[in-house]
Amino acid sequence: PWGDKMDRNYVWYGGNSGHTHHPVGTRKPNPWGLYDMLGGVWEWVSDWYGEFYYKNSPINNPKGPSNILSWHVIRGGSWIDDKQFVRTTIRYPGLADNTDDYWVGFRCARDLN
């Protein structure tokens, strides 16, 4: 929401976090009223990670592989990362059974329809 220059009022990252996590909602919301869309913790999303995942998957409700040990995507960067890693378009793989990283979390979401 801040253009080409990061506005520290909206995000926790390695440059302003004091190298620790912070309560949700302590930064300003984005223009859509959503808090902590970047920084804070990396967030698990339901997308599966693969080199060609977006190219080869259906647009609506892709199922992903049936293997529980398949890679999922984490997004958004965290309070330990440099600012170049704190953006919505960045994605990294994470194993679905590896949940012990204290800089990775998840976001609850629901369909508005």
PLM segments and residue spans:
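Short, structured beta-strand segments at or near domain termini in extracellular proteins/domains
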Residues: 100-113
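Functional-site microenvironments in short loops/helix caps that host divalent-cation chemistry
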Residues: 1-91, 99-102
